[in-house]
Amino acid sequence: MKIEANHIYQGDCLDLMPGIADASVDAIICDLPYGVLNRNNRHAKWDRIIPFETLWAQYERIIKPNGVILLFGQGMFTSDLMQSNRKLWRYNLIWDKGRGTGFLNANRMPMRCHEDICVFYKSLPVYNPQMIPSSPLSRNHGKGKMNKLTNNCYGTFKPSPSVIADEKYPSSIIYFPKGHNTESWLHPTQKPVELLRYLIRTYTKMGGNFRQYDGKRDYLRGRHHGEATVYRHGKRTEVFCRGREAHQRG
C-alpha cells in the first residue's frame, strides 16, 4: 500500500513503512514505546518496544541522505536506543517538561521533569537554530579575545565577526510545558504541539516531507507547509485515530 502525505493510518508501522519510497523523507519524528509501563495494565498494551533491527532497516531506507531522525526516549530506553545505532547517533536534546511525574515515588527518588530526544542522521541535515531572545545583560557578544585563534578543545580555528545581538543560540535543553490533562489531551504520552513545531522548524525546510508516529500501531505522514502544518499523531486504537482526525478537521 502506498502511503500518502497528510493522512493518518491505523496499523503496524512495520507493515506500513514499506509503502514509502526509498530516500523520500526529510525528517522522522517519533515517540517510540519505552517499554516502561506495567505489563499487567490492560490500558498499556501498546507500550511494547519495537525490534530495533527491523525498525532501523526501514528508517535508513526511507530517510534522505541528509535527513534527520528524532526519537524520544527516557532512562535505560534512551541508552538502548543510542546503542541500537551507534553509527548514526549524534547527540541528545533534553526536553524540560516543566512538570514532574512519578509522584508516588517522590519520597524515594526525584520526580522526573525531562525526557530525551535522540538525534540521528547519516549526513549533516538542515539546521535552523531557533534563536532565543536575550536581555541586554546577557546579549550575545564577543569576549575581546579575537586575537586568540587556538584553544585546548578545538585547536586552531579561523576568526569570525563579532556581532552584538538581542538573541542567542539555543542550547541542548529546550523548555515546553507538557500541560495538564484536558479534553484536548487525547493520549497520556502525547507531546505538546509547540514542541513538535519547534523540531520541525529546526530540522526541515518549508515544503519538507516528514513522517511521525507514536507507538507500534500508529502512523502519520505529512508535508511541512509552514506554521499550520503540525500534526498530532494517532495511537494504536481506533478511538485515538478518530480523535486525531477530528482534531485536524478543527
For each feature predicted by the language model, list its residue ranges.
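Core catalytic lobe of class I
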Residues: M1-Y231, E238-C241
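Short functional hotspots where side chains directly engage DNA or cofactors
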Residues: R242, A246
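Catalytic-site neighborhood detector that most strongly recognizes the C-terminal catalytic loop/helix
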Residues: R249
